[in-house]
Amino acid sequence: MGRKWNNIKDKKASKDANTSRIYAKFGREIYVAAKQGEPDPESNQALRVVLERAKTYNVPRTIIDRAVEKAKGGSEENYDELRYEGFGPNGAMVIVDTLTNNVNRTAADVRAAFSKNGGNMGVNGSVAYMFDATAVIGLEGKTSDEVLEILMEADVDARDILEEEDAVIVYAEPDQFHAVQSALKDAGVEEFTVAELTMLAQNDVTLPEDAQAQFEKMVDALEDLEDVQQVYHNVDLGE
């Protein structure tokens, strides 16, 4: 599972380096979550997940408040949640999650990002079956044994608990996201280094150097698209 953590860590580092882009994407995601349910995270689990994720990226409070207020104000701006699947160089598998107010534009942009970088879009279901929806919670200051004991005492299930570098990473079912965080918060954990709902590949692949360079260019092109929220893949990007 360490390679999966490398991919999550590298992705987070990449996004941290593009703060304006990541803030804009979170603003849109917070707005959609707040508009689809109550604007209160206590009663809106989807909104609570987004806000917990936003904390790990240090999204400013002003951006969060602006998105929530926009939703509360009855904005007529609507977004569709769409997932695209495809392949990169050497058959690498890719999932692209989007929030869009123009489906035709988004589909064309995603298709172009694939095709211009050695990839191609697939049909729905062509790669998703090789990924597992997973909650990933990361923290520092405790050992994996301590985290396991905390979760067991709280009767919370986890798929795996691993020590990765200076952090402990908990992998759990998506519906256990809040339960894991709540148990850890009750045990004194105040800050999480990772709080993600992600799609983890069941098997990672390693690409030749030239193919990996092209693949990374394709992923960058996808993530640069305004409507793209998340890009998941099965390539081990290494350290």
Swiss-Prot record:
It comes from the Bacteria. It is found in: Cytoplasm. Gene3D superfamilies: 1.10.10.200, 3.30.70.980. InterPro entries: Integrase-like_N (IPR017856), TACO1_YebC-like_2nd/3rd_dom (IPR048300), TACO1_YebC_N (IPR049083), Transcrip_reg_TACO1-like (IPR002876), Transcrip_reg_TACO1-like_dom3 (IPR026564), Transcrip_reg_TACO1_YeeN (IPR026562), YebC-like (IPR029072). SUPFAM superfamilies: YebC-like. One of its GO terms (cellular component) is cytosol. Its main location: cytoplasm. GO terms for molecular function: DNA binding. Signal peptide: none annotated. Keywords: Cytoplasm, DNA-binding, Transcription, Transcription regulation. The keyword Lipid metabolism does not apply. GO terms for biological process: regulation of DNA-templated transcription. Transmembrane segments: none annotated. NCBIfam families: PRK00110.1, PRK12378.1, YebC/PmpR family DNA-binding transcriptional regulator. Belongs to the TACO1 family. YeeN subfamily. This is Probable transcriptional regulatory protein BCQ_0605. It comes from Bacillus cereus (strain Q1).
